């Protein structure tokens, strides 16, 4: 498995906003309910994306930037520092 490129949360959000990438949330539904999620981020199962990872337009987000490293093929990238990186960048969060 190749290394997953890690990008700052602000860059990930900018790419999503420009329509250049999609943000996939690898966290569990419990984590999303507890901590919130980025607007428009689709929750996906890790197992599905280890077998068939996304391409260069895919950015993965997980709680601590660990699970996303398992998807590192075909040019997908991850949000550096995971959910904490997202929060530290002051990016939008949705909650129920």
Range-by-range predicted roles:
Residues 1-22, 29-96:
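Rhodanese-like catalytic fold shared by cysteine-dependent sulfurtransferases
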């Amino acid at each position: 498995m190749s290394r997953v490129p890690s990008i700052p949360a602000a860059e990930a959000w900018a790419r999503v906003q420009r329509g250049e990438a999609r943000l996939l949330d690898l966290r569990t539904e419990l984590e999303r309910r507890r901590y919130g999620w980025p607007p428009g981020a689709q929750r996906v199962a890790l197992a599905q994306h280890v077998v068939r990872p996304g391409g260069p337009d895919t950015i993965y987000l997980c709680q601590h930037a660990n699970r996303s490293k398992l998807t590192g093929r075909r040019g997908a990238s991850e949000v550096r520092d995971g959910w904490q990186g997202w929060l530290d960048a002051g990016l939008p969060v949705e909650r129920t």
